[in-house]
Amino acid sequence: TERVVKSTEELIEHSEINVKQEEALKLAAWFHDIGYTKGHENHEASSVKIAESFLEENNATQELIDLVSKYIMATKFSHTPQDIGEMIIKDADSSHFAKEYYEETSELLRQELQLHNRKNYSSSEWIMENIKMLTEKHKFYTDYALKNWNQAKEENLLELVEKQNKREKKLNKEEHKARLKAKYKNDNPERSIQTLFRVTLRNHIKLSDIADTKANILLSVNAIIIS
């Protein structure tokens, strides 16, 4: 939440909006994820209810309440922002895609999904899911984010792609070794037969050498006796 608040303030500083929009955006940033305390499903709507209740208790105007609610609902992932305010809160909410700590944040999300039995991704599956997210599902909307955050997002994407490529190369190498091992041990009876013949021949030669040695000894003994 603090990250979203800071990102919202950064975007506000570089955008042309009025005081009411600024106040509503900051409040929306603080309240946008509080609905998780009520559950994961449709948490944005739960966040709106909590924010509305708080603002009403503190005598906020209906105009401000409506604007805060509108901005909170704009953080819903499937929502396409319709104005500058929604663009700001949307970009702020996804600013972690452009942060140096993106990988750590992503891993925490994977663990959270596992903890709540929502989805269990392997490391490789999670990397691919993140690559898909950054290439197909996410985009920044404000001019400031496009100019200042998009490059960092692309660098994070590149790191993910490189990591996945290394994993695939390692798996392919291990798979190749396993295939060769299986080929020569199990899938090549001809080689096994050849090995058997070689061992048999070697044993036969050893036995012949032993027999020849014994024969030479007997001949020597007989020669001594005769003499």
Regions found by a protein language model. Name each.
Residues 84, 193, 200, 207-210:
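Juxtamembrane loop-transmembrane helix junctions in multi-pass integral membrane proteins
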Residues 21-39, 43, 47, 68-76:
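His-Asp-centered metal-binding catalytic motifs of divalent-metal-dependent phosphohydrolases/nucleases
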